[in-house]
């Protein structure tokens, strides 16, 4: 029996986001196949580690204690779930006297994430809303030298990726379309270490076509309310067009919370939207069961678990063509709809057509119920088992 240690940031609360939901699914399914899975996590300041899923002193480890902990637990495989965002774990492991385990780094988003999200508008928003003088000055300087600053950010991302890539036995990407992007940042061929494993379905079951009989005139968004990545302001502007075109019987439900929640509330009021409901942090499954359509407006995603969640619950997903893995999930017009990035008019027109045409809506939903089975947990875990056993 092999012991696998998953390492990520934050406790394993599945409502936190995609990485946590996927980690929980994989751990549960690998344990069913005879593996022993343990979880190690660090807080946002990366100052220490916690064992299990408990953030208290009894479970706290200093970085210097991690090597002994992994040895004591007889860990065979360490899976770093934060390879896109931190080199802390990699540098720690690289300093071990004797490494007795396989090290796998997972890139849970496209390597282009920093280039796509560190925008001038983000700096301007931070400048307006941060209260500290030093923070305002820092953002002001960055805006003044924005092209140079962004080039530095992108270069720094490449260095971070290189540290994690070089120290890993294998690197897991969610889409083969991301391989050349990682290669661009590393300035080398990455085929030697990279392997593609898609994310699994995260709900326990795929609904039957009978679920389509119970759908309401609801449109759904499930997302962190982080506007720089998720671009929910665009969703509200699209919804404004839809309301203005007379679709007053349809309602938009936004499930999630985040830093820009107040800003989005204010924008909805400014646009005088009538049928928009901010639901906060809630279990999302009941909302999927009621919804007919799902909106994604993100600037960037790694996989987009909410798309496969919508497909397995009979909801038609609609997304901007803004990230590589989207085409691994959706075939436009067959099991979802892909809209040219930033074309708000085309997005609104697509939704309105589906609102008008129940037959077309249900055709796409039925196809989604079938095609999402490509990502059933058994099929995805089999790929993980093959990777682990062949290293």
Features from the language model and the residues they span:
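A conserved mid-protein helix/loop that constitutes part of the nucleotide-sugar donor-binding site
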Residues: 20-25, 217, 226-241, 259-265, ...
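Nucleotide-activated donor-binding/catalytic signature segment of Leloir-type glycosyltransferases, i.e.
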Residues: 262-281
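Conserved acidic donor-binding segment of nucleotide-sugar-dependent glycosyltransferases
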Residues: 321, 331-333, 337-344, 353-358, ...
